[in-house]
Structure formats: C-alpha cells, structure tokens
C-alpha cells in the first residue's frame, strides 16, 4: 500500500481522506478486452489496481492495446492519488472510455504506460 507524499496541491484532499489506499498487483489472468466483435486489447501482463471507494480495475500495457483503433481526446482529469489522466475514444458510443496516467505519482508509478477501460463500455474476459 503506497504512503502518499504531501505537496501543496495534494495536501487539502489527502488530509480529508486519511485512510485511503491503493494496491497494485500483477494479475494472474490472461485478459481480453472487446467492444462487440472488436478485440481492443489482449494481455498476459496486466495489473490490477485496488482502490478505496472504487471497483478493481485492470490496467494493460500500452503495447498490448490496439491503439490504432483509439483516438486521443482533449479530456484530462485529476486524481490526488494517481495524478492527471488522459483519455481515448473508439467512436461516438465509446467516448473517453479508456484512460491512462502518463506521468503518475511516484506511489503508483507501476501504472505508467498502462491503460484501463471503463467496464460498462467494454467486455473484459479473464482466462
């Protein structure tokens, strides 16, 4: 479990949620991500991120994702525990459904160069 470092931008939020935790582990599953019949990603090297107040999320290495199907968007969000997230879309029905922390905070640096998918927009198979 990472110990979160304080800086002036993170301090107000981190002090309000003192027992927040994030755990990152290597998944033991073969993961396939599909949108309909389209295989978006397939990996044996995914990570699973367990975070307070969130469902577990699989993060897959960029090299295992068919990035040619995705279009980067202008959306950027901020998480005081992970950093700034960038997003990708597949089509008008799948807007901003893939995200990545390109420069995550040191406590979660393992997810650098990994992407995750909103599970309500894709089918994730585990084998």
Language model features with spans:
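Terminal leader/tail segments of proteins
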Residues: 1-127
